[in-house]
């Protein structure tokens, strides 16, 4: 396939990427001058991978695709490349675990090929051991190892400046799609637009059906466009989800496709329905939460359970209320707080009655659980732990710190400290488990969690 033919075919399959298609075709698929290495970068959902795969499918060029998210170490990375180019598994495992052995085996394998091969390193910036040295070694590999029939393609999400250094490599940038481009792509890639009636016959012309799809795309962009953040895949998933519901009145024969006003009115009704909002906000039914929690066992030590409850209280209670909740009286009993039982637990907002000095304005009190968890210092966590645990569970402070580290490794509490801690700084954490999970732990400890939560 000639170069201009490849460009034309790519433009028919990949929309709104004319500049990137032209650069990619000239740098990679021009047989007279192919670059040894090239960088494609841009945020997610910008057609980097899709354009590459489409170009390889149309040109029938040999390519080796390595996703760096599936590689754990550099040795595993070398091993996967060698296996893809035809090196024996045992030889690759024994000799290809370092850079010198990898280059030797790769050179031997590529010398047996009389055709050009493209090595695609997808999401290399997500590789745990990615570094400037590794990037430099790979970028100069075709030249240093004298492998003229090899080109390396780096696909990144972030800017390649931190990896390039002083290297001179061709870079192709994939910007985020604009609103007009996303709508253009959606309108050029419609789903099946045959509006079949109940008898199975198509009763409308193709132009009318396409017009309905274009109106639908514009309508949903006005509703979900801001939330999708110019992400084509996110917006397309929304389109595919609500499309059957949108055309249901047309299929049932209740509305003509040209009656856009009535279609939009019905669409607004189901977009704001309880079922739709619940699905959009990922709200789980309380019964499903209970069944999910009952099916899970809490395999934590007694100290870890008390620490997790303490972390939850420290995240959702203001520090000024610690003395009220966790101080001891003369009888060595925790004061706690006698809370009034709320009849409707689903109410999150309660208005304060108006007074004469409020000038007609009403304040709104928001629950701490609604505002979300807040960071706390580790000293405050330990103080609450010693206040709520019984004397039997009060172990040494060193063991408590070990259990805190365990909870942090399990991602049940997350570090909230900014930057590098200085010698006098106190580590800060934030709880990362749900209220339902902590309630189950508190029930296993016979601890009245709700009595120690601020309203």
From Swiss-Prot:
* Extent of the signal sequence: none
- Residues annotated for ATP binding in this entry: 42-49
Q: Which GO terms describe its cellular component?
A: chromatin; DNA replication preinitiation complex; nuclear origin of replication recognition complex; nuclear pre-replicative complex; nuclear replication fork; nucleus
Could you tell me the Gene Ontology terms of the biological process aspect for this record? DNA replication initiation; mitotic DNA replication initiation
Which keywords accompany this UniProt record?
ATP-binding, DNA replication, Nucleotide-binding, Nucleus
* Quaternary structure note: ORC is composed of six subunits. ORC interacts with cdc18, recruiting it to the ars1 origin of replication.
**Protein known as:** Origin recognition complex subunit 5
Originating species: Schizosaccharomyces pombe (strain 972 / ATCC 24843) (Fission yeast)
């Amino acid at each position: 396939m000639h170069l201009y033919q490849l460009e034309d075919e790519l433009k028919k399959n990949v929309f709104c990427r004319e500049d990137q298609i032209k650069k990619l075709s000239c740098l990679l698929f021009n047989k007279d001058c192919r670059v040894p290495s090239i960088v494609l970068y841009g945020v997610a959902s910008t057609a980097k991978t899709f354009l590459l795969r489409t170009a390889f499918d149309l040109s029938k060029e040999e390519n080796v695709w390595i996703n760096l998210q599936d590689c754990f170490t550099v040795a595993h990375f070398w091993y996967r490349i060698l296996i893809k180019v035809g090196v024996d598994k045992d030889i690759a495992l024994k000799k290809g675990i370092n850079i010198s052995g990898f280059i030797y085996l790769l050179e031997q394998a590529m010398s047996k090929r009389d055709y050009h091969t493209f090595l695609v390193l997808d999401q290399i910036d997500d590789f745990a051991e990615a570094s400037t040295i590794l990037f430099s070694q790979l970028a100069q590999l075709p030249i240093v190892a004298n492998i003229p029939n090899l080109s390396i393609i780096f696909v990144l999400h972030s800017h390649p400046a931190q990896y390039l250094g002083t290297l001179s490599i061709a870079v192709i940038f994939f910007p985020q799609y604009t609103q007009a481009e996303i709508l253009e792509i959606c309108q050029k890639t419609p789903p099946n637009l045959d509006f079949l009636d109940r008898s199975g016959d198509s009763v409308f012309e193709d132009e009318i059906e396409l017009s309905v799809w274009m109106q639908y795309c514009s309508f949903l962009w006005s509703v979900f466009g801001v939330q999708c953040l110019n992400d084509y895949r996110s917006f397309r998933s929304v389109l595919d989800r609500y499309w059957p519901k949108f055309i249901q009145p047309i299929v049932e024969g209740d509305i003509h496709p040209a009656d856009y006003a009535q279609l939009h009115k019905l669409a607004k009704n189901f977009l704001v329905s309880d079922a739709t909002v619940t699905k959009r906000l990922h709200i789980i039914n309380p019964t499903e939460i209970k069944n999910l929690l009952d099916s899970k066992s809490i395999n934590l030590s007694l100290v870890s359970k008390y620490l997790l409850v303490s972390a939850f209280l420290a995240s959702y209670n203001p520090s000024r209320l610690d003395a009220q909740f966790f101080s001891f009286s003369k009888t060595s009993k925790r004061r706690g707080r006698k809370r009034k039982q709320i009849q409707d637990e689903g109410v999150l907002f309660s208005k304060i009655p108006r007074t004469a000095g409020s000038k007609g304005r009403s304040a709104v009190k928001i629950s701490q659980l609604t505002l979300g968890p807040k960071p706390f210092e580790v000293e405050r966590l330990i103080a609450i732990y010693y206040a709520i645990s019984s004397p039997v569970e009060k172990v040494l402070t060193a063991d408590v710190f070990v259990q805190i580290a365990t909870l942090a490794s399990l991602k049940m509490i997350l570090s909230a400290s900014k930057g590098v801690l200085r010698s006098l700084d106190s580590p800060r954490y934030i709880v990362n488990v749900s209220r339902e999970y902590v309630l189950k732990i508190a029930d296993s400890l016979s601890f009245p969690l709700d009595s120690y939560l601020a309203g």
